[in-house]
Amino acid sequence: MKKYQRYLELDRSQQQNFLYPLIFREYIYGLAPSHDLNRNRYILSENVDYDKNSSLLIVKRLITRIYQQNHLILFDNDSSKNQFWGYNKNLYSQIISEGFAIVMEIPFSRQLSSSLEEAGIVKSFNNLESIHSIFSFFEDKFTYLKFFSDVRIPYPIHLEILVQTXXXXXXXXPLLHLLRLFLYEYCNWTSLITQKKIIFTFSKSNPRFFLFLYNFYVCEHESIFLFLRKKSSHLRLNSFSVFFERIYFYTKLEHLVEVFSKNFSSTLSFFKDPLIHYVRYQGKSIFASKNAPFLMNKWKYYFIYFWQCYFDIWSQPRMIQINELFENSFHFFWGGYLSNVRLNFSVVRSQMLEDSFLIEIVMKKLDTIVPIIPLIRSLAKAKFCNRLGHPISKPVWTDSSDFDIIDRYLRICRNLSHYYNGSSKKSLYRIKYIIRLSCIKTLARKHKRTLRAFLKRLDSEELLEEFFTEEEEILSLIFPRSSATLRRLYRSRIWYLDILFSNDTINVN
């Protein structure tokens, strides 16, 4: 993205009016939807193989060529199975859509950087990009909250809404014509409902273009929500100060203090902490609050009316469930991490003086559990164990050397430790046991010996030591301290904020 920005270092007031006409000029109007598009689909004489990294110059040349010939490029052998997008990566339309997404990302990336500078989180933005940052948010916030709701962000019911929403952000008519063309040629515009199958195919065939449209839609969705939240916070401060003045007023009148404590305490508790905590992961969002369940209901209807009025999305109130966190465990799927989050209560007893009474303090602790059953199912699919979780050998790896076999299993254990280190250790040890025993059975199968004979012939403790010392070696590189500190860190839970992608632990065969 940086290599494109250096050509476009313009004043922001001139950027929207200058950017797209400069790159594409008037040729985009030649791509406007018309009846000729469906009639003039014939094949070019040659198949030009472009590089996957398309540039703005290639996109401009392609648009010029399409404008001059007034047709879309489809190849003969793919014409029966391809629509406008197709599955052939050499299609000109594929390159144009990718270049379109690149051009559109430039102004929005600048808006993101400016918003991060205003919020003062530029330095910690890399940590926020991690897929594990949501767990640190849970540990910091959810132990103090009581009600939560897991909401799926709905897709727009009609893709024309995306075009109209984009028109408010970028006032460029050629750009809107091009965007409308892509959406028009991909799906049937006579249908008012975008089906899940169409969206799934769209996201697979043009991931960058789809991610741009989806991120733009979510950005528009969250900007209005944050505006409402900010206004609600402002009202909270004003109301809070008013009630404090009433406290001071009634405190001066001694005979009204008791009346105030009976009649106004419940009202004051509502204004104690009405803030809504919001976090988004994948296509879902979570909003939670400390108390006042009717405040959560108010925000639920905010979402419903907002979707109806702004995006024409009809949603039923029963689709948004408000749960109490202290009674129900919280299940969610994020970045390939199927997790079960629950709150455990621990009692801490303290004694200030020898003759004083004991004080019991109940503390809430967030517990993240490794999903054992889905992991065992994945290990069984990769032939490391059977469906019951009993380790088996890996026959396809017996042709490799002993060092390569051990290294492959160590890599799996390392990925598991790195990815699930912030969760329960007990569940993680059970998964590692399957991998370690599968490694020993694979080596015994290679040397054509039984498991018992192989363990007698080979020093099993030396073999398994590499598995146990691997995590300590990793921690020693991160925390170069005493061995006691390393042992404490080995037993503790650590979330690594350098993980930006989903786990690929099992797909190593």
UniProtKB/Swiss-Prot annotation:
Keyword annotations from UniProtKB, A to Z: Chloroplast, mRNA processing, Plastid, RNA-binding, tRNA processing
Intracellular or extracellular location(s): Plastid, Chloroplast
GO CC terms, sorted: chloroplast
Source domain of life: Eukaryota
Molecular function per GO: RNA binding
Role according to the record: Usually encoded in the trnK tRNA gene intron. Probably assists in splicing its own and other chloroplast group II introns.
Name used for this protein in its record: Maturase K
Species: Stylosanthes hamata (Caribbean stylo)
Gene: matK
